């Protein structure tokens, strides 16, 4: 029997999908700080996957993790985004800063 170690946060249906394939998996429910840290790790993982394969599905994975982080931290992302845009703008003008002289 081959055992693969993952030690990472997975989507809710992954354990059932694995078991439906006749395999066994070992999971636990992450709570509090462990869950928040694993969400941060997952955000990096999903962002890297999007970087390597920019498509709607990969970006949706990033968004799913962002939504989970927003929920566990009770952050109002729309308010934070609007504040940041009012102060510094968005990316609509597509400016690329090349240099600054002092």
Where are these regions (language model features)?
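Flexible "arm" and connector segments at domain edges
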Residues: 1-102
């Amino acid at each position: 029997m081959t055992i693969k170690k993952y030690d990472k946060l997975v989507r809710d249906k992954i354990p059932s999908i694995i078991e439906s394939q006749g395999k066994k998996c070992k999971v636990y429910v992450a709570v509090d700080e462990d869950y928040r840290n694993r969400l941060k790790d997952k955000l990096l993982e999903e962002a890297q996957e999007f970087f390597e394969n920019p498509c709607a599905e990969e970006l949706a994975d990033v968004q799913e993790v962002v939504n989970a982080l927003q929920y566990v931290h009770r952050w109002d992302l729309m308010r934070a985004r609007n504040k940041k845009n009012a102060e510094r703008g968005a990316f609509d003008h597509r400016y690329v800063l090349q240099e600054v002289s002092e």
